């Protein structure tokens, strides 16, 4: 599957959708910033085009992807081309105040590998650092979860919590219904409407199909 990734993702979103996605992410980061310590480094695993990391406020911004995304990520961001599972070998351990992952864990091969990845995240975090995970929830998405050929592992909020606990990430926040399933779905792409959605929690219960998890690496 790795050799197909560039072709797969290039065909999944056209340039108009990429631009709209960036506008959506600016508003999502506005919401998520409350969980991020701006006085510490942030790492975005599986960063794609850097939709999250380009907007977050932090002393240092790092991004990683198995693909070479340097041309898409702003030059002031430290980009590392590596598998998420090997990051402990190539970036500082115990260094980051926040490690972020979005729509990433479902692409891993097995549930054991999901736990291994979360243990790597725990290893990269400084004491008190936080993992922020946005994750499609198969219980809420249903069969559409498998509409993407590269989805391999099915997770609910409960299995995500269990995996995080096994990785010694202690739950700070769990929002089972947060965002719609994808930017191809029902989340508006106008920035003002996205922010209105994020401020109006009853809408999450109607449209939310992705779970937000925030976990802490305690000393």
Outline where the language-model segments fall.
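S-adenosyl-L-methionine-dependent methyltransferase catalytic module, highlighting the catalytic core
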Residues: 15-18, 23, 85, 98-101, ...
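Active-site beta-alpha loop architecture of Rossmann-like, nucleotide-cofactor-dependent enzymes
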Residues: 106
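Conserved N-terminal segment of class I S-adenosyl-L-methionine
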Residues: 1-94, 98-102, 112-118, 211
């Amino acid at each position: 599957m790795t050799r197909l990734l560039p072709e797969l993702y290039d065909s999944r979103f056209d340039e108009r959708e990429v631009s709209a996605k960036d506008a959506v992410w600016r508003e999502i980061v506005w919401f998520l910033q409350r969980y991020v310590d701006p006085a510490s480094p942030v790492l975005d695993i599986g960063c794609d085009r850097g939709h999250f990391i380009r907007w977050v406020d932090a002393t240092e911004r790092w991004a990683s992807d198995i693909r070479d995304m340097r041309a898409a990520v702003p030059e002031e961001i430290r980009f590392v081309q590596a598998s998420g599972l090997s990051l402990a070998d190539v970036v500082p351990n115990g260094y980051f105040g926040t490690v972020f992952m979005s729509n990433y864990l479902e692409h891993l091969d097995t549930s054991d590998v999901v736990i291994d990845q979360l243990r790597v995240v725990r290893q990269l975090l400084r004491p008190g650092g936080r993992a922020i995970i946005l994750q499609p929830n198969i219980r809420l998405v249903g069969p559409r979860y498998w509409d993407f050929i590269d989805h391999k592992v099915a997770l609910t909020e409960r299995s995500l919590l269990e995996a995080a606990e096994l990785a010694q990430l202690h739950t700070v926040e769990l929002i089972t219904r947060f965002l719609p399933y994808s930017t191809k779905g029902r989340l508006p792409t106008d920035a003002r409407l996205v922010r209105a959605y994020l401020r109006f929690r009853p809408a999450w219960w109607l449209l939310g199909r992705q779970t937000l998890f925030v976990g802490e690496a305690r000393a």
